[in-house]
């Protein structure tokens, strides 16, 4: 079957199509209804079927390949490497599942995971899946304020963390950040389970904090039966940035997620059991959830958990891993590759990369120079793909397992099966023609594996994603165009979310952080193009006192203070690249901030129609501030 036929069947006969794909995983109880779309836009997949992500990732491989590699944990920071076969991983996951139960974690309870990229983090997520607990991973780069907001939203009974992580030789004190977060949160977890790596001192709260290693010793050899979950029960909550400043908890199911990932590993990524998949992301992001934690194991592949930078201790660290473990498929973000471009290609080419068949890049638009450099340096195909936290797996790609069409530089490919993608005119809602810019939307129902709803807020789910046009379609909030051959090109965000090195950040979140500085009267944050990171945040601040406008030393001092504040409240990846001080900001006469206009000026583009602006002189201030 050609990819075109495969795709059309998924759109025209979705129930039959996905019922066939569901055979890729084990079901303890068969589903009675493939799709329930009786309450749109909500979609329920594989109704009344019972399955389990942990069983499909580990247990079902115990008979076929118990001694095959399953998990490879590498830290270039501590120079530690650990490997687990499927049998060994099964033992460890059972022990941690027993530990969780001993701490009172039950089916449906939330477990918040705030950990570095170590084996225990991955094992904890699989243990949650085993017993039917809902895991919610918070990216290790988030500061206490952001962690506290997620604690209050998810209300976990247990938090699993560590003393510290490391990045580029710098210690990140997870426990200290977590203690600060818990002190700020209204919700209080019953227990905090802590992995002590010996990297940083940590204070322990009596009666609440539990040592991971000591408890594990008590549960070695335990066997915990799989909790067979109805397909539409919740597997995880993963927070993504929103324009309101309050992060959205993307809620995902069990059966649909497993089927979507298993199908994607075969058809999109061409993964084969017994081979090794290296996704150089973080489990705190959706790419890590899907293609570090679950998808490779669902396909019987080994997966790599990597702690460190692509350049630490040197620019060959990734390629040493590829060579040593015979990695066949690799997944990263363009930003990481742009960093590597600064180093001599000889440092990469000195490694034996003959096992590597393809490199996948996602998280931000892939530019032509980066794609060409990778392809020439590694001598492998480079496959872009486009998706979101909400989708859980690629919306667009080239399905290497089915499709032999060539890649097209600058394009993430064509719509994937299950996604009825349209480009709509933002004003009329009418479909766009070839090479006409429009908003990229998906007709409902969304395919398996996608967002079920926003955790605890169905109304926000409908209002945010399904209410932009006169008819209900899922809005991606990305601009796109389609060429005559069906290739799509992503042109950027339509909302106030920016993409910094593959990390989505709400400009409102950064603005709220900056606004909390006592010297700030008003602020506007926009994302601007950056050669290395794709986008960076920049801030324009109206200070309460005029000395920041008149004295460069004062302005520099205030800029440093504001950056430090954002670091502490959001994390250093949210830090603005620049903070400029102005006496007024461009707004419409109704008071709406003209962020797109500010962004255009920052990027040297035509700001467009300015008929609604209240005071054109405010634009001159933006220009002058940038020139100083």
Curated annotation (Swiss-Prot):
InterPro entries assigned: ACAS_N, AMP-bd_C, AMP-bd_C_sf, AMP-binding_CS, AMP-dep_synth/lig_dom, ANL_N_sf, Propion_PrpE
Domain of life of the native organism: Bacteria
Primary enzyme class: ligase
Metabolic or biological pathway: Organic acid metabolism; propanoate degradation
PROSITE patterns xrefs: AMP_BINDING
Function: Catalyzes the synthesis of propionyl-CoA from propionate and CoA. Also converts acetate to acetyl-CoA but with a lower specific activity.
Family note: Belongs to the ATP-dependent AMP-binding enzyme family.
Protein's recorded name: Propionate--CoA ligase
Natural source organism: Escherichia coli (strain K12)
Gene (UniProt): prpE
């Amino acid at each position: 079957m050609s990819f075109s036929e495969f795709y059309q069947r998924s759109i025209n006969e979705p129930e039959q199509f996905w019922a066939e794909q569901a055979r890729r995983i084990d079901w303890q109880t068969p589903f009675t209804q493939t799709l329930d779309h009786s309450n749109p836009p909500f979609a329920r997949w594989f109704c009344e079927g019972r399955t389990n992500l942990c069983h499909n990732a580990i247990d079902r491989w115990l008979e076929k390949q118990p001694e095959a590699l399953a998990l490879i944990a590498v830290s270039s920071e501590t120079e530690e490497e650990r490997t687990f076969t499927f049998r060994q991983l099964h033992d460890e996951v059972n022990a941690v599942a027993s530990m969780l139960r001993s701490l009172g974690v039950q089916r449906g309870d939330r477990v918040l995971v705030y950990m570095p990229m170590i084996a225990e983090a991955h094992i904890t997520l699989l243990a949650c899946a085993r017993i039917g607990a809902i895991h919610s991973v918070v990216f290790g780069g988030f500061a206490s304020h952001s962690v506290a907001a997620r604690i209050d939203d998810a209300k976990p009974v247990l938090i699993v963390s560590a003393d510290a992580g490391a990045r580029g030789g710098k210690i990140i004190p997870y426990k200290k950040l977590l203690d600060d977060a818990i002190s700020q949160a209204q919700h209080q977890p019953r227990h905090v389970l802590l992995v002590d790596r010996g990297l940083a001192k940590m204070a322990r709260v009596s009666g609440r904090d539990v040592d991971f290693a000591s408890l594990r010793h008590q549960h070695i050899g335990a066997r915990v039966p799989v909790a067979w979950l109805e397909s539409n029960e919740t597997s995880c909550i993963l927070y993504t940035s929103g324009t309101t400043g309050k992060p959205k908890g993307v809620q995902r199911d069990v059966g649909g997620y497993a089927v979507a990932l298993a199908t994607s590993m075969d058809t999109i990524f061409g993964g084969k059991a017994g081979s090794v998949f290296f996704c150089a992301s973080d489990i705190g992001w959706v790419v890590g959830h899907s293609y570090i934690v679950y998808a490779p194991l669902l396909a019987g592949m080994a997966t790599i958990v990597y702690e460190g930078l692509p350049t630490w201790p040197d620019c060959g660290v990734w390629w040493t891993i590829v060579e040593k473990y015979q990695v066949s498929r690799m997944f990263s973000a363009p930003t990481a590759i742009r960093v590597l471009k600064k180093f001599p290609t000889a440092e990469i080419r000195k490694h034996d990369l003959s096992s590597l068949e393809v490199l996948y890049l996602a998280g931000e638009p892939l530019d032509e120079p980066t794609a060409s450099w990778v392809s020439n340096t590694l001598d492998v195909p480079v496959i872009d793909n486009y998706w979101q936290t909400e989708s859980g797996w690629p919306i667009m790609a080239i399905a290497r397992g089915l499709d032999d069409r060539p890649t097209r530089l600058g394009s993430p490919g064509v719509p994937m099966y299950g996604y009825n993608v349209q480009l709509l005119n933002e004003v009329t809602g009418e479909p766009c023609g070839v090479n006409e810019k429009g908003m990229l939307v998906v007709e409902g129902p969304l395919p398996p594996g996608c967002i079920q709803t926003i955790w605890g807020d169905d109304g926000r789910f409908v209002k945010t994603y399904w209410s932009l046009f006169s008819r209900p379609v899922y809005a991606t909030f990305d601009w796109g165009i389609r060429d005559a051959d069906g290739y799509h090109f992503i042109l950027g965000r339509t909302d106030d979310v920016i993409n910094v090195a593959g990390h989505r950040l709400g400009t409102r979140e950064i603005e709220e952080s900056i606004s909390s500085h006592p010297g700030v009267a008003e602020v506007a944050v926009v994302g601007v193009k950056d050669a290395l990171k794709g986008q960076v945040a920049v801030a324009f601040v109206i200070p309460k006192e005029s000395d920041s406008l008149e004295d460069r030393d004062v302005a520099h001092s205030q800029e440093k203070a504001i950056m430090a504040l954002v670091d502490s409240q959001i994390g250093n990846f949210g830090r603005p690249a620049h903070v400029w001080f102005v006496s007024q900001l461009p707004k419409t006469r109704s008071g709406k901030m003209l962020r797109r206009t500010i962004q255009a000026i920052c990027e040297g583009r035509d700001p467009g129609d300015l008929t609604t602006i209240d005071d054109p002189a405010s634009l001159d201030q933006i220009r002058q501030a940038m020139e100083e």
